Amino acid sequence: MAHALVTFRDVTIDFSQKEWECLDTTQRKLYRDVMLENYNNLVSLGYSGSKPDVITLLEQGKEPCVAARDVTGRQYPGLLSRHKTKKLSSEKDIHDISLSKGSKIEKSKTLHLKGSIFRNEWQSKSEFEGQQGLKERSISQKKIIFKKMSTDRKHPSFTLNQRIHNSEKSCDSNLVQHGKIDSDVKHDCKECGSTFNNVYQLTLHQKIHTGEKSCKCEKCGKVFSHSYQLTLHQRFHTGEKPYECQECGKTFILYPQLNRHQKIHTGKKPYMCKKCDKSFFSRLELTQHKRIHTGKKSYECKECGKVFQLVFYFKEHERIHTGKKPYECKECGKAFSVCGQLTRHQKIHTGVKPYECKECGKTFRLSFYLTEHRRTHAGKKPYECKECGKSFNVRGQLNRHKAIHTGIKPFACKVCEKAFSYSGDLRVHSRIHTGEKPYECKECGKAFMLRSVLTEHQRLHTGVKPYECKECGKTFRVRSQISLHKKIHTDVKPYKCVRCGKTFRFGFYLTEHQRIHTGEKPYKCKECGKAFIRRGNLKEHLKIHSGLKPYDCKECGKSFSRRGQFTEHQKIHTGVKPYKCKECGKAFSRSVDLRIHQRIHTGEKPYECKQCGKAFRLNSHLTEHQRIHTGEKPYECKVCRKAFRQYSHLYQHQKTHNVI
């Protein structure tokens, strides 16, 4: 028997206008998925001709029945069958494509659509041998869904439908006999009395009562009523996403998902609201939008009274109150209440960041993060607060800001009763009480309460400093550091001391400065009891007790406990004195030395004694002076036990003993 090339008609299912109108939304969606997948599989097998009209219509989201009679009979080279294509009549059974003797069908599934049966031949491993000495060909791992149906009359699907019309034939009285739709005939469910247009719908409905779910997933045990549902579900386990966007490379499990996504690139919004002329990418978005005009919000939460337009969002919201988190990450065990949150979370483990900013090269895990980031380059802040006019790059920032005006904080901590505007803020806060630090550094094992803090910490190991100052080129690990640094270039010092009039760039500098006037030293050493104005000074002091001197000078080998001391010491070798006095021209290696020197010219004496009112340029001079009032003499001679208020006095005294 001669080999014949398989045409597009061999793998298509046709409907007349009347038949198409009988299908419900789910069945039309199934038809669209199957047809598009058939066509894509044929293309992958070598077809390079023009695209059939029916495929074009399906891709555009239009109804295919108009072009059903125009389906091309064009032949597709590279794919062979053992039978020539035949015109199909309404009274003849549709036959299978039969393969050569060595053919093995690993798996066969049947998809039903209003009584029509789609034969789904999976992974056909066939070897075709031509009559004229052609080499063996193997077609493996190809998924081809054929319109042909097995002639095996014992197949259980024949109980629903034994024959199907060719699309060139209109629906007639024989349609009922074939399991098709006849709008005049109603089928009643004996269990609940529900009425259906056809046997197929009734059969599907009855599975609700019987609980029949014959298709089981071997991976997770989940069961489905139909094989095509199982097929789609299995892609979640395999990770298979056969539909790829040509623009950005993003892949999808279903073709309709790709179709919706592509509208983002084209900018097409074909679904328009007749009330306000607003356009949308999908019909679902339009349907949701219409409820704004109708005011229909049918799903109300009994816990908090919040209302929702869609039951899907309502069910997601309910999980906040119940605490149910059905979506668990297999990598780290973290659970989520929403499937989309799990999908986003999993990208953390893969490390994939497919969305790159063309301006600065920064990459992101999610497309909307990139969209938000782009606004920083464009300077756009589209989200404006109607109360105060403040604008934001990100909608979430605006939502957080609004809580300032409303003052509503519905989420309260059960331990300390502190209230928060957002549940996420409460979750983070609760870690203070529990001590939970879920984000651990793999390099050093240090753990953190916040992921953002871990990200900043990891840059210590990698050395990455992504934030660069455009003025001087200096780079920083943390965004807040560059924000502070930028104020150096502006020379703006908005924070002024009421006592002495000194101004500061940052509020915390002013806070520390005010302790000089108040004498407050909140940071105390547990070893020796010495107290400090600044936390940093205490940290440096603690190194004296530990004996740790991690900063070594490569020039002379001298070690230092403080980085600042080490930096200043290095200037001895380099001789660099970058800080010059504008009054007298004297230069200094440290900026602090220049500031102290400038007090000679200005006459500034910020350190005042509370006992007698005497003022000093240096804090150390005030400390020495206060010993006159207290009588404290901390410097004692080890030879004669005489004590002194100042170290310089002890130094001079020791010369009398020839100690120095």
From Swiss-Prot:
Gene3D superfamilies: 6.10.140.140, Classic Zinc Finger. InterPro entries: C2H2-ZF_domain, KRAB, KRAB_dom_sf, Znf_C2H2_sf, Znf_C2H2_type. It is found in: Nucleus. The keyword Repeat applies. GO terms for cellular component: cytosol; nucleoplasm. A zinc finger (C2H2-type) spans 187-209, 215-237, 243-265, 271-293, 299-321, 327-349, 355-377, 383-405, 411-433, 439-461, 467-489, 495-517, 523-545, 551-573, 579-601, 607-629, 635-657. Coiled coil: none annotated. One of its GO terms (biological process) is negative regulation of DNA-templated transcription. Belongs to the krueppel C2H2-type zinc-finger protein family. This is Zinc finger protein 540.
